[in-house]
Amino acid sequence: MVLMIVSGRSGSGKSVALRALEDMGFYCVDNLPVVLLPELARSLADRNISAAVSIDVRNMPESPEIFEQAMKNLPAEFSPQLLFLDADRNTLIRRYSDTRRLHPLSSKNLSLESAIDEESDLLEPLRSRADLIVDTSEMSVHELAEMLRTRLLGKRERELTMVFESFGFKHGIPIDADYVFDVRFLPNPHWDPKLRPMTGLDKPVAAFLDRHTEVHNFIYQTRSYLELWLPMLETNNRSYLTVAIGCTGGKHRSVYIAEQLADYFRSRGKNVQSRHRTLEKRKS
């Protein structure tokens, strides 16, 4: 397991890096005192979870020896890595001007330029021990996250999770949906007394819907639309794509079609989840 220690000058992108690491599965803690690193690592060792911790000028150890001792006290399962982010002086000044945030050392009545320079001196002991130093001066937020994924996972894109969920319009549209497709115009198994108590997960309902050409056409055209734009969505630094399929009650048509789409993209090697809001409500 890895204990990634993220440090660097304020405004260089530590928060962005920590969010990217969290998306990669790291357990992330912002501004944890160095002396508590071994305790955090021990609490995660049994769970087999890598961790990432940010350290800035506010929680710097008083001496390099304290940092070294904390590294020695880490459980054997953890391999510490120190990532140091930096940017040139003018870039840091511009970023502070854009965000209008206060520098951590501004309480010392220093100008922004002086605070940046003093911070560099205070962080030098960590910078000199860094396993990787990254200059973010010319990087966007997305480029920094992409670089970290490439370095740590060996791939550029974050793995996108596709979520296909069915719902009933009479219960409301899911607020977390990126795309909403209305299938209320398709043939409705509800009007068959034998099928009415069943759901789109049952074979007789699936057989009923499978007999209709318009159902096949809708599934084909919907998956074609998603396939067309999926490459761009995968490179857009997002973790989830939620596709909501709605019918009147959320019991038959939407359930069947959500499952068909989920199975298709799962067979193409995508990371897929499916859920059925109305059916889950009935269980609870």
UniProtKB/Swiss-Prot annotation:
GO molecular function: ATP binding; GTP binding; RNA binding
Residues covered by region (RNA-binding): 266-284
Pfam families to which the protein is assigned, alphabetical: PapZ_C, RapZ-like_N
Gene: rapZ
Lineage top rank: taxon: Bacteria
Record-stated family: Belongs to the RapZ-like family. RapZ subfamily.
Keyword presence, Cell inner membrane: no
Binding positions (GTP): D56, V57, R58, N59
Keywords: ATP-binding, GTP-binding, Nucleotide-binding, RNA-binding
Entry keyword GTP-binding: yes
Function field: Modulates the synthesis of GlmS, by affecting the processing and stability of the regulatory small RNA GlmZ. When glucosamine-6-phosphate (GlcN6P) concentrations are high in the cell, RapZ binds GlmZ and targets it to cleavage by RNase E. Consequently, GlmZ is inactivated and unable to activate GlmS synthesis. Under low GlcN6P concentrations, RapZ is sequestered and inactivated by an other regulatory small RNA, GlmY, preventing GlmZ degradation and leading to synthesis of GlmS.
Protein name: RNase adapter protein RapZ
SS bond partners: none
Chain positions recorded as ATP binding sites: G8, R9, S10, G11, S12, G13, K14, S15
Organism: Klebsiella oxytoca
